[in-house]
Amino acid sequence: MRAINNILLAFLFTWSASAFGQNAFKVVPLGVKGGIDESNLSAYMLAPANSNNFVCLDAGTLHTGIEKAIEKGAFKIPAEQVLRKYIKGYLISHSHLDHLSGLIINSPEDTTKNIYAFADCIETFKTRYFTWKSWANFADEGETPQLKKYHYKVLSPNEETQIENTEMTVKAFPLSHSNLTSSAFLVKSQDSYILYLGDVGPDEIEKSHNLELLWQTMAPLIQEKKLKAIMIEVSFPDEQPDKTLFGHLTPHWLMKEMDDLEKLSGGGSLKDFNIVVTHVKPPQASINSIKKQLAAENKLQLNLIYPQQGKAILF
């Protein structure tokens, strides 16, 4: 009987640790900005909290971000080992250079791994980036000779895919980004989720339903407390005219989209919910305005998080 009680107590302890405060994910931002500063462009290493098997969400900046992360204590090994051993693959949201240039520049020093993206993004890698006129073909498709370091994995919308050599899976969703298809990645580890959005404009301006459909998928996960955070861009302050957003969000439009999400997930469901604000565009005065405007418009009481390059975040 005592043995049964001990087993029961151990189970309850494990369950309570899981239910109250145990972290599911760690995020190491390698780059957090949306332009100009080539040393700090969109890239976020993501892994289960107890693992060093990371996937990189976009790859605008790699080496500089890894060095910053080492300086801030996120990693205890040399930068080249983080690149070669810890990053197991890349989820690329779309084909704009500020989201993948770090991957290209670091490719000679990298190890064999997968690049996951929608078909049109992978086609751009094949025909524009990993070619012998612009760089070298480090992939196993496209121009010859092929150096076969990277393998392309085409993602299908709303289809779960294993992220190889990690404990995570991903579902990709199309997003509207002006004249280009971007993507959102819903990453799962055990029974927890985190959502990362590449560049995206509001449905109303983009004449799209992509965010609406995405929020419909997220609402049940929010209700069940399984979605730990949404990482979403706010590129410009509210002073930016709608006609020159070019497929991006402002504080006003982010909060409009969050209102739409809360209508689906239930009143009060987003209070203290983690929103990681990504892709803020310099200059610093604009970034300061974005933060002030988001604070003023935060009627839903979201937990707004502004990632810092190299500083790990736990969810």
Identify the role of each PLM range.
Residues A24, L30, D120-S182, Q190, ...:
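Metallo-beta-lactamase
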Residues R2-F54, T61-H63:
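Zn-dependent metallo-beta-lactamase
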Residues V27, Y44, D58, H94, ...:
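Divalent metal-coordination and catalytic microenvironments
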